Amino acid sequence: MPIRIAAPHPRVRTLAGALTCVALLTTPAHAVPITVQDATGKPLPTVMVSRQPVQAAAVDTSDNGYPASAKPQQAYVELARFTDAQGQADIPAAEHPWKIRLRKPGYQDQSLLAADLGSKPIVMAAESDPAALAEQQPANAWSSTIDFANAALKKEFMLQCNFCHQQGGAMLRRERSADDWDSAIKRMVRYGARLSTEGQKTIPALLEAHWKKIHANPALVPAGTPWNPALAQATIRELPIGDSMSQMHDLLLHTNGMVYVGDNLQDRVYEVDPATGKYTVYKIPPRPGDQLGGLLAGRLRDFPKHETYQGIHSLAESPKDGHIFITPSYQRRLIEFDPQTKAFRYHEMDSGFYPHTLRFDAKDRVWFTLALSNQVGMYDRAANKFTLYDLPFRSLMERITVKLTPFIFKLLGWGIPVANYVKVDHVSTGVPLPYGIDVTPDGKAWIARLHTDEIASVDPDSGKVTMIKTPFSAPRRLRSDRDGNLWIVAFNASQIARYTPSTGQFLRLDLPVVPKGSDTPYSLNVDRARHQVWVNGTNSDSVYRYDIATQAWSMFPMQRRVTFTRDVEISPKGQVYVTSASFPSWHIEDAQPTLIEITPR
């Protein structure tokens, strides 16, 4: 039986959808003109002007530090615009006490209360201190300096040690001893990273020496990607949700106009109205017999605070009735959420391990990856039936390891750090890791298998699985465009790629990141209406846009440093949504995860 939670009156889908479409058009009538100059009186373009509340909105924290389930909350929406060639930007006034923060690489940050703005230009002072200039750069600029004298080991490090958080961010570039790095890597391996045994042994001393050198010579940190003057047309809105113990992993823009965000560490779904900043939290109740930490109870043993029974990962909307399906990675089930009644329903599986990313097909079937059992799953809602498709193994040893995975995690749950005792090779034998998934217009399900450098298709009629080797490493998540082509992120290659099924050809595209090759794109999505690809700049505090027709790139910097994003959603009007999803969230500049909305123009 579904579990129901008392809820506000259901919204009318079409009305709410219309509200989202005008989210960025609905601002207070009074806009404050901002003019920014340098010390010589010259206009300063591409200054990020952020409107921030003087104090965060008061929200309910009665449920272990979070809002009570089904109790509406009101957050303060933050907003950022960029100055034009004349150094000017208009900032809509807020209805609460607010301030602005000015940020531009090469200049000192400034903050002013709204009451102190006046009519005179604001002067930004140039920054000359090498250490301060280095601190302004995003994580990718810092991580680009890492040199192990072994390019393959560096790529492996960026693949395995960038899974959950940035490399080169403020927390990960501090000077530490080799022993401290060794302890951190052991903890990371218990969380599930597959850094090779060789890397686990050699990298701690290399990191100790490297960051000691960089902190002694901060001028070695290069500049990040330049901010383009076209940013003057963009608006970025940001809504704080959750806290430093949250992880806002994936999100879904629903046809009812709401954005749904899953807190992976606290088993809560946030239902957000992006037009107003109002949101409601719905806590997923554990089933009888569920244990804290689920089937991976030992994984979060060292984490200070979590309520993870499910481990919310991916969300997708049914094309039939608008219900939301969720992958709970720490269980053998799918979770169904009715946005109108607010009821949760559980669909149990008797096999498979770690349900990961999911998508619907046109027949209202749910396709999903099972990351640790090397399978693709399909749930037929009409028949109430699961079908699992086995993917091939690379070796007998891998087959044995995958079959033993549930037992290995049981040992971890008993406090035995078996992951730290197992020998790991450079290609992660034993954990092939089927990851992202999408369905092309012809009905085929396509997956990316991260550790084997492959994509695969599943024919729903015949059940045939076809494996295809990629000419790049670490295909992570993928999406289909309107023509049935697949767009894939190459995580540690700092690229995206297009695969054309009709020809079997790959087209590889470098991200426009500076320094070249320094980003780790986690995911992407395709705006089919505008024929554009939006890409997570996961290690660079940015989101990229690639226009397929013109082959032009754009880059949109985020307001907070250490904005680690994992997913992209696109509205019918072209707004783009991401979440700041670092694990842990206290790595974020102010330790505050957010829902972010980008309007390009």
Mark where each language-model region is:
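Structural motif
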Residues: V32-P45, N64
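Short, acidic Ser/Thr/Gly-rich low-complexity loop/linker segments typical of extracellular
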Residues: Q55-P92
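A short, solvent-exposed loop/turn motif at the edges and junctions
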Residues: Y76, W98-L113
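The canonical Cys-X-X-Cys-His
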Residues: F157-G168, I203
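Beta-rich, blade/repeat-based domains predominating
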Residues: S244-T255, P288-P319, S351-K363, S395-P441, ...
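Conserved beta-strand positions in repeat-built beta-propeller and related beta-rich domains
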Residues: V259-L265, T308-Q310, S318, I324-Y330, ...
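Short loop/turn segments that connect beta-strands within beta-propeller blades
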Residues: D273-G277, D338-K342, D380-N384, D459-G463, ...
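Blade-level signature of beta-propeller repeat domains, shared across WD40, Kelch, NHL, RCC1
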Residues: T565-R601
